[in-house]
């Protein structure tokens, strides 16, 4: 299996709405975590690991478990919201907590995924359950490619360097949005949203 082809297909897949179920909450977590490179790398790592577990069917999550898993996302965004509400002076410490929370959001939201299957991902999903380690490199390549918007947020943050007040405001808004997304999953809206995104992704 060609790792490069899998990565390219992952990049191309970001135009498909069905990927938003992962990208939107993770982007919110990254912005809420001040989009440092530590937070960005942690978030993408969470997506990569979660995606591999999804592809290999190492973890199969039903609707009830998805609603329970959303509590992790709600707690993560709750902590991020609380930290963003603190004064700028309290935000100067290295964002280790934000990195852990972003990784958790990336890992959990992959269990909410209903992927739009292309050639490479289709092969991964077919071979993954029986050949988990053989499909690991290509699976990671696909998920990292799909995470290109998250990496772009890190680049924009590095180039822009917003003031502490602006960064805190953006983080506060992003954390609040992520909290609402988590609550929508708990309330049972996830299935309808994912089905709609999947339909939008069909040619």
Annotate each predicted stretch with a short phrase:
Residues 1, 62-114, 159-173, 187-203:
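Alpha-helical multi-pass membrane helix bundles of inner-membrane/thylakoid proteins
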Residues 6, 25-61, 121-160:
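A small-residue-rich subset of transmembrane alpha-helices
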Residues 13, 51-55, 77-84, 109, ...:
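Structural signal for membrane-spanning alpha-helices in multi-pass inner-membrane proteins
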Residues 1-16, 93-112, 130-143, 147-148:
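Small-residue-enriched transmembrane helix starts and helix-helix packing motifs
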Residues 17-25, 112-124:
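Transmembrane helix boundary and interhelical junction motifs in multipass membrane proteins
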Residues 54-56, 108-119, 178-191:
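Hydrophobic alpha-helical transmembrane segments in multi-pass integral membrane proteins
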Residues 16-24, 76-88, 145-158:
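Membrane-water interface of transmembrane alpha-helices
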């Amino acid at each position: 299996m060609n790792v490069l082809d899998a990565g390219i297909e992952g990049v191309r897949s970001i135009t498909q709405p069905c990927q938003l179920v992962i990208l939107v909450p993770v982007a919110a977590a990254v912005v809420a975590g001040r989009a440092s490179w530590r937070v960005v790398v942690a978030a993408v790592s969470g997506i990569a690991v979660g995606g591999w577990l999804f592809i290999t069917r190492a973890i199969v999550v039903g609707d009830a478990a998805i609603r329970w898993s959303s509590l992790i996302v709600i707690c993560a965004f709750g902590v991020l919201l609380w930290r963003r509400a603190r004064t700028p002076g309290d935000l100067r410490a290295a964002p280790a907590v934000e990195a852990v929370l972003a990784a958790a959001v990336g890992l959990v939201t992959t269990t909410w995924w209903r992927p739009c299957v292309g050639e490479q991902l289709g092969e991964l999903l077919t071979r993954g359950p029986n050949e988990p380690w053989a499909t690991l490199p290509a699976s990671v390549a696909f998920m990292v490619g799909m995470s290109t918007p998250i990496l772009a947020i890190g680049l924009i943050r590095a180039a822009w360097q917003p003031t502490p007040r602006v960064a805190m405001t953006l983080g506060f808004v992003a954390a609040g949005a992520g909290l609402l997304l988590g609550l929508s999953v708990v309330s049972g809206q996830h299935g309808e949203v994912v089905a709609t995104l999947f339909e939008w992704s069909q040619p």
